[in-house]
Amino acid sequence: MRHYEIVFMVHPDQSEQVPGMIERYTASVKEAGGQVHRLEDWGRRQLAYPINKLHKAHYVLMNVEAPQNVIDELETNFRYNDAVLRSLVLHTKAAVTEASPMLKAKDERKAPEALVEEVEAEDADE
């Protein structure tokens, strides 16, 4: 089986449907004997340029190992699902399991807030 990196962007008004979509897509990969190596929900992010007069979208990244027929099925689902604004499926040479730069940047932004909370907690204890 081949390895793929899949990114899809969902309409911001349909963000509550994203967990269900992720569940369906991962289930179809696993049913075919594939494996999900990495799954990241990046949340709502600003678009570089407007798509259908929208300036934000909900991003999801998946790294999967699956047969070609499953990937074709996923691409068809993306194409006919009105909530999916854009999708990209790339063939990769190996499975990628480490956190993506987007997720690392998100964690780094949260880290200073956590440090401030720790300092405030220490000050409260004294």
Swiss-Prot record:
Q: Which GO terms describe its biological process?
A: translation
Q: What's one GO-annotated cellular component? A: cytosolic small ribosomal subunit
The disulfide bridges present are none
Q: Which Gene3D superfamilies match?
A: 3.30.70.60
Q: Does Isomerase appear among the keywords?
A: no
Q: Provide the residue span(s) of the region labelled Disordered.
A: 103-126
GO MF annotation: an example: small ribosomal subunit rRNA binding
Tell me which Pfam families the record gives: Ribosomal_S6
Superkingdom classification of source: Bacteria
Q: Where is the composition biased (Acidic residues)?
A: 115-126
InterPro entries referenced in this protein's UniProt entry, alphabetically: Ribosomal_bS6, Ribosomal_bS6_CS, Ribosomal_bS6_sf, Ribosomal_S6_plastid/chlpt, Transl_elong_EF1B/ribsomal_bS6
- Write out the entry's keywords from A to Z: Ribonucleoprotein, Ribosomal protein, RNA-binding, rRNA-binding
The record describes the protein's role as:
Binds together with bS18 to 16S ribosomal RNA.
User: What family is it from?
Assistant: Belongs to the bacterial ribosomal protein bS6 family.
PANTHER family, alphabetized: MITOCHONDRIAL 28S RIBOSOMAL PROTEIN S6 (PTHR21011), SMALL RIBOSOMAL SUBUNIT PROTEIN BS6M (PTHR21011:SF1)
Write down what this protein is called. Small ribosomal subunit protein bS6
Q: Which organism is it from?
A: Glaesserella parasuis serovar 5 (strain SH0165)
